[in-house]
């Protein structure tokens, strides 16, 4: 095993031990602790590529979690899995639920835009320029929101918006 991987595994294990210790001593409700444990286990399964297991843990976490920011993060991770599995409509739907819980998640908007932009490129390859423009306009709409939430964080998207003529001057104000 390469030394970088050993170091990363050590860091992951150390973080897990520290996080578990903090969760045990924190003055929070048992329900919240369980929600966090399900979330943590979902994240571990997702990082290991076991997406079905991760989704099950995330669903359990959502049943217990009341904090909107944490719910938004859990939903975002579920949407990432759906996106990875090619379930684009379900991914968009789940990103939108994440944004309802926590509207300040620019990465959700960025990823929705990636799906729209991909659909636009596919339409272009099929010679359907009207459909391409519809999808590109939708991508521009959500990407503009993402850039406003995270200025300078998505330079490639900012460049796409400028180069495609879909950038508005007020986006940077």
Swiss-Prot record:
Q: Kindly list any coiled-coil regions of this protein.
A: none
Q: Which organism is it from?
A: Prochlorococcus marinus (strain MIT 9312)
Q: Which gene encodes it?
A: ycf3
Give the membrane topology. Peripheral membrane protein
Going by the UniProt record, its keywords in alphabetical order are: Membrane, Photosynthesis, Repeat, Thylakoid, TPR repeat
**Cellular component terms, GO, for this chain's entry?**
plasma membrane-derived thylakoid membrane
Pfam families reported in the protein's UniProt record: TPR_8 (PF13181)
- GO biological process terms, semicolon-separated: photosynthesis
Extract the InterPro entries matched here: PSI_Ycf3_assembly (IPR022818), TPR-like_helical_dom_sf (IPR011990), TPR_rpt (IPR019734), Ycf3/AcsC/BcsC/TPR_MFPF (IPR051685)
Its biological purpose: Essential for the assembly of the photosystem I (PSI) complex. May act as a chaperone-like factor to guide the assembly of the PSI subunits.
NCBIfam families xref list: PRK02603.1
Protein name according to UniProt: Photosystem I assembly protein Ycf3
